[in-house]
Amino acid sequence: MKYFVVALALAVALVCIAESTAYDVNEELENELDDLSDAAWLAKAAEDLQALDDFEESEESRSMWSGMWRRKLKKLRNALKKKLKGEK
């Protein structure tokens, strides 16, 4: 009987220790879900970057950038003309 009480006390002690130091399963699942959502976000960002790289090589992109530079250079040319006319 004495051994039974000691074994029972040890079992209860081990259960209490395991209960107090165990990780919460829900918390682990939430962490895994966060990791999955982060991975999904990173995958989407990688796809968007790839699409952007493809866009930069397209004819539409080149015409957009050339149009932007053309407008900017035209604006600078007009500003230079105004400045030169004002100095004369």
Swiss-Prot record:
Keywords recorded for this protein, A-Z: Antibiotic, Antimicrobial, Cytolysis, Fungicide, Hemolysis, Secreted, Signal, Toxin
* Record keyword Secreted present: yes
State the disulfide connectivity. Answer: none
- Coiled-coil segments, which residues? none
Q: Where in the cell is it found?
A: Secreted
Per the UniProt entry, what are the Gene Ontology biological process annotations, in alphabetical order? Answer: defense response to bacterium; defense response to fungus; killing of cells of another organism
The record's section on InterPro entries has: Latarcin_precursor (IPR018802)
Q: Which residues get removed as pro-piece?
A: 23-62
Report the Pfam families cross-referenced here. Answer: Latarcin
Provide the tissue specificity. Expressed by the venom gland.
**What does the entry list under GO cellular component?**
extracellular region
Role according to the record: Has antimicrobial activity against Gram-positive bacteria (A.globiformis VKM Ac-1112 (MIC=0.5 uM), and B.subtilis VKM B-501 (MIC=1.0 uM)), Gram-negative bacteria (E.coli DH5-alpha (MIC=1.0 uM), E.coli MH1 (MIC=0.7 uM), and P.aeruginosa PAO1 (MIC=4.1 uM)), and yeasts (P.pastoris GS115 (MIC=17 uM), and S.cerevisiae Y190 (MIC>33 uM)). Has a moderate hemolytic activity against rabbit erythrocytes. Causes paralysis, but is not lethal when injected into insect (M.domestica) larvae.
Instruction: State the name under which the record lists this protein.
Output: M-zodatoxin-Lt1a
